[in-house]
Regions:
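Beta-lactam-recognizing serine transpeptidase/beta-lactamase-like catalytic domain environment
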Residues: 1-165, 210-211
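Short amphipathic alpha-helical face segments that pack within enzyme cores
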Residues: 54-60, 174-181
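A generic structural motif
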Residues: 166-170
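Short, gly/Ser/Thr-rich active-site loops of penicillin-recognizing serine hydrolases
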Residues: 87-89, 94, 178-211
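Extracytoplasmic/secreted cell-surface and envelope-processing proteins
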Residues: 74, 171-174
């Protein structure tokens, strides 16, 4: 066959738009507009090239994966009430998109993300089944890469999804350590006072690049 970077970019763009990666996340605060990759399909397909997304946009992306294609806008609110407790506005999730992707494809993606977690010493130690993907984003050779993690839990019936980014954080392992604490807090896996101590947790942290 003949390789076509142009055709490859068209296909990549098609699927990125299906995931609404060309839209802001919906949060009620100022948010930088996403930038989808526009050149070099080989590098773009692994998240490099000129693509740029906020952490909240990555959070909506992994939420869509966790829900097998159901896409929602993010919000900072649950509801607005008056002084008497009457609900003035409800911020219950509204479906904004539904990807037409086969269930077997979602299962394959979920299984791959589960495999990442089971092979990770930190994530596999949790008493809740987690699925996720680690990554490092290289921006400048003169500075450390950004550490990233996206994931959801529980694996079989997802309830929460998250994205963690540590700017110039060296390693995705450092982002995983933050994610572990979030999962532990949500599912009461560790004492709250230990998790919210007000001091930095240096366990499992590294300045060695990974991924």
């Amino acid at each position: 066959g003949v390789f076509s970077d142009e055709q490859g970019m068209k296909t990549l763009t098609k699927y990125a738009e299906m995931f609404r990666m060309n839209e802001k996340s919906g949060l009620e605060i100022d948010e930088t507009a996403p930038q989808m990759a526009s050149v070099d399909v080989v590098r773009s397909s692994i998240g490099q090239s000129d693509a740029s997304y906020t952490t909240s946009q990555l959070a909506r992306y992994v939420t869509t994966i966790a829900s097998r294609g159901i896409s929602y806008d993010l919000t900072l609110f649950d509801k607005v009430t008056d002084a008497d407790g009457n609900v003035l506005k409800d911020y219950s999730p509204e479906v904004k998109g539904d990807l037409d992707v086969s269930d077997s494809t979602w299962s394959t993606v979920h299984e791959g993300m589960r495999g990442v977690a089971t092979r990770n010493a930190v994530l596999s130690s949790l008493n809740v089944a987690v699925a996720g993907k680690t990554g490092t984003a290289q921006e400048d050779l003169s500075r450390p890469s950004h550490g990233l993690f996206i994931g959801f839990a529980p694996y079989e019936d997802p309830e929460i999804a998250m994205a963690v980014r540590i700017t110039n954080g060296y390693s995705s392992g450092n982002a995983v350590s933050v994610a572990k604490d979030i999962f532990s807090y949500v599912y009461n896996l560790e004492d709250e006072s230990d998790l919210l101590s007000g001091t930095a947790n240096t366990d499992n942290l590294s300045n060695e690049p990974t991924d």
